Structures are given as C-alpha cells and as structure tokens.
Amino acid sequence: MKYSIKYIVFTIILFGLLNLNTNVFNKNASVVKTNDISYVKDIWNPLISDSVNEKKIILVVDGLEVDVDKQDMFMDENLNIMISYKKLKQNFDCAVNLYDNDRLVFEKYNTKIELEINSNTAYINNAEIELDSEPFICDSEIYVPLELVAREFDYDYQWDIAANKISALNNSLDNPIVPYSYDLRDVARNSKVKNQGSFGTCWAFASLTAIESSLLPEEELELAPDHMSLQNSFSSSQNDGGEYTMAAAYLTSWQGPVYEKDDPYGDGVSNPNLTAVKHVQEVQILPEKNYEKIKEAVYKYGGVQSSLYLSLTSPTSKSVYYNRKNYAYCYKGEERPNHDIVIIGWDDNYPKENFNMVLEQNGAFICQNSWGESFGDDGVFYVSYYDVNIGIHNVVYSLIEDTNNYDNIYQSDLCGWVGQLGYGRESVYFANAYTANTKEEVSAAGFYATGENTDYEMYYISNFENIESLGVNNRKLIKKGKFENAGFYTVKFDTPKLVAEGEKFAIMIYINTPNSVHPAAIEYHAEESTKNVDLSDGEGYISNRGKKWDSVEETQSCNLCLKVYTKNVP
C-alpha cells in the first residue's frame, strides 16, 4: 500500500509518542514523563482528519460510487466519517425522518436507530448506546456518523485511507427493506385530510397531499389545489379532471405549489402572481403493480399518488365494492381509473374477509381520500392488493427543495411530458440552446426518463452558435448515470459553468431507455387541453446518433422537455 509523505511523517510521530516517554515541561521547567493516549490523540487526530478532508471522500455502496459533494461528508477529529443525513435515505434504502428539528429516526425493516442532535447517546431498537461522535448541525446541515448507520443496517464497512474511500457492502440484500405493515399516521407523516367538493380536482389534491406528506415531519405545510388546478398551462377547467402528468408539469416548471391560505379552495378565484413556495426537482413514476416498490417509496419518501376506479360518487353513496363497516374497497371489473388517492401505508395481514368479495389472500394498501373526514375512517380507507387498478399509476415526489436552491429556470415545456420522440430505437440524443439573461452559473439540468433503467449522459456546449456547435469537439461531458424509475430528474453539475449576459449555451442529453422506441419526452399540441403549447420559446434539436441534427420545433412541431437551472453571479 502506498502512503503519502504526510502519512509517513504522521506514522513516525505516532511511533515516537506511543513508544517513547515524551518529555513535556511544566510551568516550573521540570521534566514530566507521560504516555497519555489522549495527549497523543489531540496531536495526531487533527492532522489525520485535516489531511483526509483536503480531498473529496469517495463513498461506494454495493459497488456503485455515490454522488456526494465534498461538503456532504468529512472526517471529524475522532476520525469518524460524518455525513449529511439527507444522503442516507436513497443510498442505504432506509426511512429517514427529523422530528422537532433535533431528533433523527432511521428505519429499515426491523431496525430502528434514534439519534439526538448534540447528544452522544443513541438508541438501537430502544437499547441505549454511547457514540464517539455526536450528531451536530453545521451551516444548517445535520451530520451523523456514517459507520453507525451502515453497521446497524448490516453493511460491511471498510475505510481505505490511501484511496480516501469508504466501501459499504449490504449483507442483507435478500431481506426486505420494509416491515409487514406501516402507517404514516403512526409516525406523524400524514397530512391533513381535505375535501375536493364537487369539482374534478382529485388529481391536484392527491399530488399536493403526497407532497405535504413528503415534507413531514420536518415541515407542516398546507398547499393550494385551487392554484394547481387553475394556474397550470393546460386548457382545462376544474370540472374537466386531470392526471399526475399535469401535476408534474405544474410543479417541475415552478408554477407552484403555493400556500392554501394565499389561494383558498372553491371560490373560483386564483391569483396568477403567486410564486412557488417549494421547488419540486424530482418526480419518480413507480413500476406498474410493483407493490414492493410502492411500499419502499411510502417508507422512504411519504405518500404515493395512485389511481383507482371508484364506484362511489360521494362519502354517503353505496357500492357493492365498498364495505362501509370496515372501510374496505376492492374493484375487480374492467373500468379504468377515475379517481386519484394517496397511499399512506399498507398491511400485509389486513383480513381478506373485510372486503365484499371472496379474495385469495390478505393484504391492503392504506389510502387517504379527498372527500373529507366523513368518508371512511376519518378520510382513510383500505384498498385490497387485488383491486385491478390500484398500483398501476404511481407517483412519488422524491426531491422537494427550498426556493433558494437556484435563482433561475430556463424552460420551454410548461405542459411537460405530453408525448415522446425518437427514431424507433432505445437511444436518442437531444439538446436545447439557451441565452443567459445575466451573468450566471449554470448549475443543473432537468429532464425526463420515459422508462425504467434509463442510462444518461449530459453534455455542456459553451458559446453556442448553430447546429454545428453540437459537434463532438464542442461537447464537454458533465455527468453520466442511470435512473432506476421513469420520471423527472434534476442532475447537478459538479462544477457550475459561468456564462455572461447574452451568452448562448446548450445542454445535450444522450439517453438509452430499454424497450423504448421513442425515449425523449416532448411537449406538443396533442389535444384540446394542450392547445396553448408555445413553440416560439424553445430551440431544441434531436439526433439519431449525435451527428446529424434536426430542429424539433420545425420538423416535429414540439418542444423538448429539458430545463436548466442557474444561480446569479454578483
């Protein structure tokens, strides 16, 4: 193993301190001999941690390098790796929740870790342990000891000082992530039950209920379905209904959400000048009827927006498919979904006898409706795993940030993912050109994966002039990776790109979506609701193999779903 000169010097110092009696002078100039290990640590540990923190620490989980910024992870003076708690949810497949701004709870299957900010006492399944390094807050970020979480969740944990790398390998890949039953109501992660009244706005209520749940328990917000259903870019009324793609378009375009108090529901009035109070940067679309993925999403992110065919027309109406006594619903006919709800939990052992029909096995999702508290169990009911529609369309809002994350958004697809474009194959290149409004840093780009396991490469082109600027020699690779689920994703630049006022630049994406023939998401005039699509605000190009390019506005009458996020530079 090759060590740096620093580590050789440190080793010599440590050897001298540990094996020789060290002479130190007291205030009377007499010699004092000591082998105090704490004295050695006071000298040695800061030297090691400073050297480690000079470089970025690499984190590899199950063989894959994790996208972690340098400020998200560091070594403290106890030689423990501390990591932002926000990086653990996705990378260690666990539930992570912050209560009262000072208590963190990590959960995975049958393991529960409880930490308190600035306390060296922790609890593992209610058993008390002592920590070498306590969780703490720095620059509004909470850091926790990585090794504790990894080992308690049964990962092998290895630190390679020469490579500045941590490797964590899951020993329990065959074990489930989630327990047999889970209810967001039990952990203060369900939002307030609302009432959509007589309007066809269940899609907006479900979307915002899911977002409110995702923000809990850290933040308790009440968001406005009125604004989402009236101030989006679609040509439809509150009586026309909607779907999750409309909600995603409104949210990822930063048209909202806004507070309910600023746009009260049901009065037919909505202020067009309100601005978003949160920025939704990621929307995952979960695989059809994949109940384990749905459960994991509820566990990790909060409520999951889903759809079913509801034969009921009001809280007091009757249906052969609904057992009012047990709040239990199951539909097994051929009707398509007509109503959106939010999955807030599940119970694998919920009795099949509670439903109005003979079912093969137990099990149900716990769902929150938007018909007020007079429906079901204070607005909540059970939907059998055997319902034909539940779990087909599933959306989770997995990255919701404060509005200071970026200063500007450049976009031309306010209606979002309306259709798809491609060349009859799984891969495609597409690019959008933009002109900077002022001196800015290009910090991230956002686009859709239209199917599961989509590989992507993202390129930056400076000083864009025309199609020729998209040539191979002008592209700079920014990042590449894979999206497990379909959905909208924001990809950050490791190093932002500076642009001057009036400078033109472009973002190019290469994607490969298995089993797709049209992998690029586009906005176009598909039906009456998208008749107001504006083709004059975008400059997009598409290519089969990244060599010959066509304008999508001119040849396909559409806009590419590709956004750019920037920060202002003083």
Where are these regions (language model features)?
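Positively charged n-region of N-terminal signal peptides that target proteins for export
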Residues: M1-K6
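Hydrophobic helical h-region of N-terminal Sec-dependent signal peptides
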Residues: V9-L14, L18
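Primary recognition of N-terminal secretory signal peptides and signal-anchoring hydrophobic helices
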Residues: L17-Y180
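Catalytic-core signature of thiol
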Residues: N171-S443, Y448-G481, T513, H518-E527
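Short, surface-exposed tryptophan/glycine-enriched loops
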Residues: K293-V298, Y489-E503
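Short beta-strand segments enriched for Tyr within beta-sheet-rich domains
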Residues: A445, E503-I509
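Short proline/glycine- and polar residue-rich coil/turn motifs
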Residues: K480-G487, V499
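Short, surface-exposed beta-strand/loop patches at domain edges
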Residues: Y510-P570
